C-alpha cells in the first residue's frame, strides 16, 4: 500500500488527477454504481436535460476493465506524464489550458460526429503533441516496427484499424493535436505570426506556483560595495 501511495505522490499533479479520474470512473462502472449510459457524450441531453457532467465523464471512461482499457491507460498515463514533465515542465497552467483547448475542440467535433466517448481521441491528441515536440526520438512498437516519434500517431491509427475500431476517433485526436501544435509551435514563429493560445491569467493564478518577487537591490543581503573606498585593512604591529 505504501508503494502505491508513493507512486501516486511521484506523479505530476495533472497526470495524477486525470488518470486517477479515469480509473475511479471505470471502477464505479465495474461495481455498478453507475452505468455507461449515464456517462457517454450526448449533446441533446447536455443542452436539454442539463446533464453537464457528460462533458467530463465522456473523457474519463475507456470501457470496462480489459486489454483495451489497459492499453489506453498506459498510453494516456505515459504521454500525459512525459508532456507534463517535458515541454510543459514548470508551466502547469499552460498544460491545463492545452487540456481545455483540446477538450473544447473535441466537444465541438462530437456535436457533428457520433462518438460516444472522447477519451481515446484525447489520448491520441496527447501522443500527437508529444511526438511533434520530440521528432528525433526513435520508437519501437512491440518490437516489430522502428520509426521516429512523429509517425507514432499514424502507427496507432493503423493498429486501431487492425483491431476493428472506429478510425474517426483517432483522426479526431490527430486533427485536434495538430491544430494545437500549429497554433502554439508553428504559426507564432512565422512571419507576421501571432500566438493565439496565450494562457489566461486566472489559470496562471490557480495552477502555477507563485514565486516571491525579488527584493530591491539595495535590500538584498550580502555582497560588497565595489566603489572607490576599499575596506580598511587591519593594522598589525
From Swiss-Prot:
What UniProt keywords apply to this chain's record, in alphabetical order?
Endoplasmic reticulum, Membrane, Protein transport, Stress response, Transmembrane, Transmembrane helix, Transport
- Regions of biased composition (Basic and acidic residues) lie at 212-222
A single GO cellular-component term on record: endoplasmic reticulum membrane
| Cytoplasmic topology ranges | 1-20, 76-97, 188-237
* Protein topology in the membrane: Multi-pass membrane protein
Q: Induction: what does the entry report?
A: By endoplasmic reticulum stress.
InterPro entries from the entry? DER1, Rhomboid-like_sf
According to the record, the signal peptide region is none
Parts of the chain on the Lumenal side: 42-54, 119-166
> What are the start and end residues of every segment in region (Disordered)?
212-237
Xref: Pfam families:
DER1
Subcellular localization: Endoplasmic reticulum membrane
Mainly localized where?
Answer: endoplasmic reticulum
Q: Highest taxon of the source?
A: Eukaryota
- Could you confirm whether the keyword Transferase appears in this record? no
Question: For this UniProt entry, which segments traverse the membrane?
Answer: 21-41, 55-75, 98-118, 167-187
Function statement: May be required for the degradation process of some specific misfolded endoplasmic reticulum (ER) luminal proteins. Participates in the transfer of misfolded proteins from the ER to the cytosol, where they are destroyed by the proteasome in a ubiquitin-dependent manner. Its precise function remains unclear, but its ability to complement der1 mutations in C.cerevisiae, suggests a similar function in the degradation of ER misfolded proteins.
Name of protein: Derlin-2
Amino acid at each position: 500500500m505504501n508503494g502505491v501511495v508513493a507512486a501516486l505522490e511521484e506523479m505530476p499533479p495533472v497526470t495524477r488527477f486525470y488518470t486517477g479520474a479515469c480509473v475511479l470512473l471505470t471502477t464505479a462502472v465495474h461495481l455498478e454504481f453507475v452505468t455507461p449510459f449515464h456517462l457517454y457524450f450526448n449533446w441533446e441531453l447536455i443542452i436539454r436535460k442539463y446533464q453537464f457532467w457528460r462533458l467530463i465523464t465522456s473523457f474519463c471512461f475507456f470501457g470496462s476493465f480489459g486489454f483495451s482499457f489497459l492499453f489506453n491507460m498506459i498510453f494516456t498515463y505515459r504521454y500525459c506524464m512525459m508532456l507534463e514533465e517535458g515541454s510543459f515542465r514548470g508551466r502547469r497552467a499552460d498544460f491545463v489550458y492545452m487540456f481545455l483547448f483540446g477538450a473544447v475542440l473535441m466537444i465541438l467535433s462530437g456535436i457533428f460526429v457520433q462518438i460516444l466517448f472522447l477519451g481515446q481521441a484525447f489520448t491520441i491528441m496527447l501522443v500527437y503533441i508529444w511526438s511533434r515536440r520530440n521528432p528525433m526520438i526513435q520508437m519501437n512498437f512491440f518490437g516489430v516496427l522502428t520509426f521516429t516519434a512523429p509517425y507514432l500517431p499514424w502507427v496507432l491509427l493503423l493498429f486501431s484499424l487492425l483491431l476493428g475500431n472506429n478510425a474517426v476517433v483517432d483522426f479526431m485526436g490527430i486533427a485536434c493535436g495538430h491544430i494545437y501544435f500549429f497554433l502554439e509551435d508553428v504559426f507564432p514563429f512565422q512571419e507576421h505570426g501571432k500566438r493565439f493560445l496565450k494562457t489566461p491569467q486566472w489559470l496562471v493564478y490557480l495552477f502555477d506556483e507563485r514565486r516571491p518577487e525579488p527584493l530591491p537591490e539595495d535590500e538584498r543581503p550580502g555582497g560588497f560595495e565595489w566603489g572607490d573606498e576599499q575596506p580598511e585593512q587591519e593594522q598589525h604591529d
